[in-house]
């Protein structure tokens, strides 16, 4: 059987699948309060996305506390409990290596707001309605 390698510019199907499984596992662990830290458990944290490196040894976890406040505190607390979170992932998933977890703020909502702002711009609205054609006088 021939070995097919991923040559595209984006993540492979395996990276996407493993990232989604890690995201679900972390979301469940945080939702159930399985990390025994009252400071962490008082925050309602959304795990928006997990991006895995090609070798699946590093997982970058994009998180955002509910309301968008205390982002740095949430990342610091998650980083503090990185080992325990890795342990939960290895119990739920069968991987050759337990990925190193790196926590980053989830900027999806910021990008969404910027996109909405752009679409509400008068010039863009005129282009959308007019099909992008220039006015002729």
From Swiss-Prot:
GO terms for molecular function: ribosomal small subunit binding. GO terms for cellular component: cytosol. Keywords: Cytoplasm, Ribosome biogenesis. The keyword NADP does not apply. Belongs to the RbfA family. Monomer. Binds 30S ribosomal subunits, but not 50S ribosomal subunits or 70S ribosomes. This is Ribosome-binding factor A. It comes from Cereibacter sphaeroides (strain KD131 / KCTC 12085) (Rhodobacter sphaeroides). The lineage of its organism: Bacteria, Pseudomonadati, Pseudomonadota, Alphaproteobacteria, Rhodobacterales.
């Amino acid at each position: 059987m021939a070995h097919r390698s991923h040559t595209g510019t984006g993540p492979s199907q395996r990276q996407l699948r493993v990232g989604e499984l890690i995201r679900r596992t972390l979301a469940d662990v945080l939702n159930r309060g399985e990390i025994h830290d009252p400071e962490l458990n008082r925050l309602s944290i959304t795990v928006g996305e997990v991006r895995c490196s090609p070798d699946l040894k590093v997982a970058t976890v994009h998180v955002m506390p509910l309301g968008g406040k205390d982002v740095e505190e949430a990342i610091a607390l998650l980083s503090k409990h990185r080992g325990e979170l890795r342990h939960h992932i290895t119990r739920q998933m069968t991987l050759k290596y337990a990925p190193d977890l790196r926590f980053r703020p989830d900027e999806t909502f910021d990008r969404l707001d910027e996109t909405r702002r752009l679409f509400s711009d008068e010039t863009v609205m005129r282009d959308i309605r007019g099909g992008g054609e220039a006015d002729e006088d």
